[in-house]
Design a protein with these regions (language model features):
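Short, conserved micro-motifs composed of acidic
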Residues: 262, 340-369
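Active-site palm subdomain of RNA-directed nucleic acid polymerases
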Residues: 168-181, 284-315
Length: 432
């Protein structure tokens, strides 16, 4: 027990697992860059442009809020500090979370004092508004900056205040967000949405009805959130002015650098977006997405569920092609009003009935017979045997990769058995 991290490190070392490394990249004109300084400049140029504020959208800052929410308690700070995971990369200050664990009560008192000062003045230390972006490769050409997730690393000390702020927002999350939004919410997860889609398809087949799904993909959804629109949305949803002011001042004047394989870039300003890797981002994006869905007129009645959401993964559902297209066009229109753009090339339709070819802004929306939805294969005929076969194949591939470990005489039998038993909890129920 307690050696799981070391065990998986040994397994990776033994298997020789491939780790993607950031090598040469292309400039905006498609030319290869190999020099360290050129690569750093390109990463700064790309990321700065990605998070650049729209010039036509001026800031509207309110005065300091005097009607404050209840003070932060020391026990809140202690609980938050204990909940921060160990062995995580540090932010720009380079201070590891283990230091706060060593200091214990002294760290709690010090952080409580700082957090309470922020709470009263709504002003954040500039060091806590500085972030480090780490590019993580996605599928596609690794030489294109756009094929990377820009994951943010923030100071562990600031995480304490951010987690307290997130906890205070939770009551509004539970009140304002519908059950169809399962992204980053306690007691909900990807399996719930997968089960919902399978159940809907099963019922449609049982009552001999056609069902049409549109799986929407947004282009850089989290990175395109407009801050001023976000503050207005929070106000409309009844979020306390004090909490909104704290959020607004956290995002005002944010700075970032990009950590590349050749060192870090110069610091630059962040003008829009909610950064992937910050625990506040999913919560804020869920409010943002809920607002646009309401504006699109998509509401959840007792007997009418026409969408499922997991953060920015949005699925529209209808019983006819015309109804689905109408829903999609409404969502597209309202999304563009708040700065979000649909990626038509990655937006797919799965239909159990007849459907014609669609074009939006000159691009064809592809109709497919199956789609990987939140990690599970959804087929137009609703047959789950395709997903079962896929899972078996994935499992067989993993076992083949681990063959050298399971056959190794250096690994004891109890260790092999114990590692297999540990996966028992994640097995789902399959109706035979």
């Amino acid at each position: 027990m307690g050696k799981t991290r070391d065990l998986f490190k040994k397994i990776r070392d033994t298997r020789g697992t491939f780790h993607a490394k950031m090598g040469s990249i292309k400039d905006r004109n498609g030319m290869d860059l190999t020099e360290a300084e050129d690569i750093k400049k390109r990463w700064q140029e790309y990321t700065e442009e990605l998070y650049k504020k729209d010039l036509h959208d001026p800031d509207n800052h309110d005065d300091v809020i005097t009607n404050l929410e209840p003070d932060i308690l020391e026990c809140e700070v202690k609980w938050t500090l204990e909940s921060i995971a160990m062995n995580k990369a540090s932010g720009g200050d380079g201070i590891p979370v283990e230091l706060f664990q060593i200091l214990k009560d002294d760290a709690v008192k010090m952080l409580h004092s700082v957090c309470q000062q922020i709470w009263k003045t709504q002003q954040w230390p500039q060091d806590w508004k500085r972030s480090v972006f780490t590019p993580i490769p996605k599928k596609g050409n690794a030489k294109e900056c756009s094929n990377y997730h820009t994951i943010v690393l923030i100071a562990h000390a600031s995480k304490v205040m951010i987690k307290i702020l997130q906890a205070r927002l939770q009551q509004y999350v539970n009140c304002e967000l519908p059950d169809v939004q399962a992204g980053f919410r306690k007691g909900r997860g990807t399996r719930d949405q997968i089960a919902n889609i399978c159940w809907i398809m099963e019922k449609a087949r049982e009552f001999q009805k056609n069902i049409y799904f549109c799986f929407i993909d947004y282009a850089k959804a989290f990175d395109c959130v407009d801050h001023n629109k976000l503050w207005k949305i929070l106000k409309e949803m009844g979020i306390a002015d004090h909490l909104t002011c704290l959020l607004r001042n956290l995002y005002a004047g944010q700075e970032a650098t990009v950590r590349t394989g050749h060192g870090t870039t110069d610091w630059f300003q962040i003008g829009k977006g909610v950064c992937q890797g910050c625990i506040l981002s999913p919560c804020l994006f869920n409010f943002y997405a809920e607002y646009l869905m309401r504006k699109a007129g998509i509401k959840i009645a007792r007997r009418n569920m026409n969408n499922l959401r997991y953060a920015d993964d949005t699925t529209l559902m209808a019983e006819s092609e015309e109804e689905l297209k109408s829903l999609l066009m409404k969502v597209k229109e309202e999304s563009e009003k708040v700065g979000l753009r649909l990626n038509i090339q990655k937006t797919k339709i799965v239909a159990s009935g007849p459907i014609t070819s669609w074009e939006i802004d000159g691009e064809t929306v592809e109709t497919v017979s199956d789609f990987i939805f939140l990690g599970s294969k959804i087929t137009a005929d609703g047959d789950c045997s395709h997903e079962i076969k896929r899972r078996l194949l994935l499992g067989r591939t993993v076992m083949t990769n681990l063959d050298s470990i399971f056959k190794s005489r250096d690994v004891t039998l109890p260790t092999k058995v114990r590692s297999s038993q540990g996966y028992g909890f994640s097995c789902g129920h399959v109706r035979m």
